[in-house]
Amino acid sequence: MFGLKSSSLFSDTKKLEREIDGFVDILSEVGLVFKNIVPTYLSHSANGKFDEMVEKVKEMESKADKITKEVEHTLYEETLIPDARSDVLRLLEHMDELIGMYQGNCYHFSIQKPNFPKEFHQDLIELTETVVNCVEALCLTVRSFFRDIKSVRDNGHKVTFYEKESDIKFSSLARRIFDSELPLDQKMHLRYFVEKIDRICDQAEDIADEVQIYAIKRSV
């Protein structure tokens, strides 16, 4: 439709390619850890596994911050891809916010310790899985922007698909919570957690839209 070019943005440097690949890897890995964190929390595991996972997310977030600084240094010190420099840095910043949202959810579970009745466990786990799938699709979208720009639109469509699925699951679970016999304050507390998880998809979709705009800019 837009005659997108298929050339790689990394034609001049493998170092930058490795750095950005490493950042996207971390975003993907944080999501996979988070997918396990929620069922681990719900199982009331007493062996410290939940706390270990939260600490792992914290460590990966720190690594992502370090890579962001390295990419910024590489772009400016070596004057690479000047026409796309600001877009790349903005993209990394927004993906870093996504990692922060994962981390924030972990901390909220750790500190506030919401009491989800067993009847809601499976729905919460499925919502979490959909959210992680959405971010995984975003990772593919970002990689395609740097490697094979013709694939950006197809991968971005997958992000939108999972975002809509997440909205459906969120609405269904929130409705079930408020239809239950739980006290109102507990209903509000549980809804807060469900909504915070769902918002990760909203951020992922915003970033995917951003990437598609950058892809169009590269094609003209």
Segment roles from a protein language model:
Residues 1-220:
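Cytosolic, long alpha-helical scaffolding segments
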